[in-house]
Amino acid sequence: MTDQPPAPTTAERARLTGAPHDVARWRKWGPYLADRAWGTVREDYSANGDAWSYFPHDLARSKAFRWGEDGIAGFCDRYQILCWSLALWNEQDAILKERYFGLVPGEANHGEDVKECYFHLDALPSHAYQRLLYKYPQRAFPYSQLVDENRRRGGHDPEFELIDTGIFDDSRYFDVIIEIAKEDADALLFRITAHNRGPERAPLHLIPQLWFRNTWSWSGEPVPAPSIRAIDIDGNPALLANDLTTPPLAGLLHNAHLGAHVLEFPSGTELLFTDNETNGPRVWGPGAQSKSRYVKDAFHRRIVNGEHDAVNPAQTGTKACGWQRVEIDAGASYSMTMRLAPSGHARRDDDVFEIRRAEADEFYDAIHPKKASAEERNIQRQAFAGLLWSKQSYLLDVDIWLDGDDPNRPPPTERERGRNARWRHLNSMRILSMPDKWEYPWFAAWDLAFHTVVMALIDAHFAKEQLWLMLFEQFQHPNGQIPAYEWEFSDLNPPVHAWAVWRVYNMDRIRNGADRPFLEKCFHKLMLNFTWWVNKDDREGNNVFEGGFLGLDNIAVFDRSDALPGGASLEQSDATGWMGMFSLVMMRMALELARENAAYEGLATKFFEHYVYIGAAMKMMRGDRTLWDETDGFFYDLLRFPDGTNVPFRVRSLVGLIPLYAIERLERKWLEPFAVFRENFDWFMKHRADIVDYCVSTVHDNGDTTHVLAVVDQNQLQHLLARVADPEEFLSTFGLRSLSKAHQQQPFVFGNASVAYEPAEASTKLKGGNSNWRGPVWFPTTFLMIETLRKLEKAYSGTVRVALRDGHDFPEPHRDATFIDTRADEGLGAVSARPRRRGMTLTSVPVPPPENTTTLTGLAADLARRMTNIFVPDADGYRASNGPRGKRQAELFAHDPHWKDLIWFFEYFNGDTGEGLGASHQTGWTALVASLIDEWSG
């Protein structure tokens, strides 16, 4: 992150930086509908917590959602009162295409997985312009084939994708492009353009839908519902939607009524009406009653099944649609435009779509780095688009959810002691950034931290708001814990929130000026979170942490969320490393705040000292316990039994590299304004040298003095970076592997369990099996490593170099570190560290020729390039993310002009080939590629 001048003023930038009331109006409408609401914890009222079985895809068209709607290219107001989305039918499918289809864990060989082809093409932060592409097959959608074939496959097999079925062969599909453009903050235009890519004329039904989220059925008392009815506007059909007949939303301090809105359709559109109510007999069984004669699945029954009496002939209800059937010639297209605006709202006569699209071009031209290639600009823009499309109105009141509010179906009593029972305070009516709105349509705290770093490049206000919300009283637990994700809010994720707050603050400071109130309010709530971590996971008070799950789903031998048998505990290298990083970031925040309030100097001292205790504890645990293995030169988790015996888990994974992340530097000249902190610091350095020596060193360079605060000392740094830079260990052609490739030939075995290098999907179903940390490349952890290398470069004044290896000579069981100081003739002259008291002496290593080494910044730049190259096509048009040559998907994306510029941002990537795996729309943290392009392009 380098100092940059403020971004040039553009129309979109003006919308984002206007008066707060005007900015809020522009944000009122957006892509806030989920891609999937079925199968979520929010909609699960079962006794056993099996959300997938309780509300499957097959019931989604018939059952009213309680906590939020879904749809294709969905758009709604911020409280999801009035919703718009697109449904389609090709006259071949047995159901309307109202929502994206995917497999649940029991149907798939690697956990839940969407089986559709859609792409986020463009978006603006104000949502003044949005564009999405959905590829809709002309043949019958292969629902059963996808389920049957994936169910047949095992964990070692690749997933069977929609493209693999041959459904897109001969280009027999429609490219359906949905564009949304705002005339102003209150009026929306929707344009659907369907292109027939096939060789023959083909029919297509376009069914844009408008409906009210059901907020009126969850009380024992009758509540009047809102209404949608047919009207005529200048001879064209239209819908008048009015929510003033129903009570305002509960839980808000203001009235969120939308008032009367009109959705206008082109001539020739047929209007259909029903109610957003559950089809009782279909959902609950024969004899069950529906609250309305006209129910949620009416359009499916009318259009697909021909049931004319399924829809309301009175042309009124709480759900409506416009229906057009068209036949499109081969190579031709058809467009349909609609307008949604408050009743009587003035209309613009100019071409709003062209204006807004040009404004999007203008906005991103000011964002893209000047040295970025055309391909990098395409990658960055689609990553931003995916990030913005992934906003969602996340609605959940855990207190009501636990008790239930459907008077006809009270929830089972088991829920009182089950999932999230201790999170009754959590109450969200907020727009939140989702990891992936189909696969993960719920906020995940540590994912969100990375989202904000990317979001800050285009919308710092929203990024800061997201970070604050996780610390807001309606989210953060009174004990200080930050909620993890709805499957278990109490699970532990890596404590990266402080890092994200500090990074976003500085990005915003450079571009827009320091926002001290934001930093200060976050700092105070983060202190609560820090205290919670210390009290929760440092059971012996020795500053070595037992963090549990920590986000890396299957990286350990067993599920780290589970209690260990026999009273054993797992002392975790990554948990302790994360806490060291947390301490240092809090120290830096406190010093920043101390610029205007000296009281924060005492807090900076507290966090500095806590960092030292943590850093020293990793190397001076009681007895023979230590997380650092001097022989292997690596940090390992340690399994500790009540009888005092210890078993190191000799797994070379990210767990042992994460201690590198705990790195900051303090230049003496920085400390001059902070007299109290400087005195405390110097006293501690002098009088607690017994522990300071383990994790603080001092660098003298050209008369300047810098204190390097690093959990890893120089000896450990040598060993760890040698493995990071080794292609036979962590260095992949496409980034940083999550597990050393050495375990391909040398699996770690513990009892009946083992950990082996698996570069693709997981072969086991630990944590559901839909992600894998045993070999693949992940963006968030590599991003942090890149940042760590840059910090180390600055800390050691560019004197450190690391050898580059060709990956062909790999002595076992371990190698000496190949790491040199450029001032080798001075020994350690430039790095005058105190001697280490536990045998942490520098390993004698051969010095390779200079042409075979690089600086740490060079290694960071190389990692950034490798990560970006996952998405950059080679000379023949192949992107590594699409899989190896010869694979059906890779060939399609490489050679078909209607696919070649489209990008999926996968959850993680094959550690050997770079192929994208897991969730396919993880923008989400894979949008970090946009940050890498911003910082490292050219």
Placement of each model-derived feature along the sequence:
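Acidic, mature catalytic/reactive cores of soluble proteins
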Residues: 2-55, 59-62, 72, 80, ...
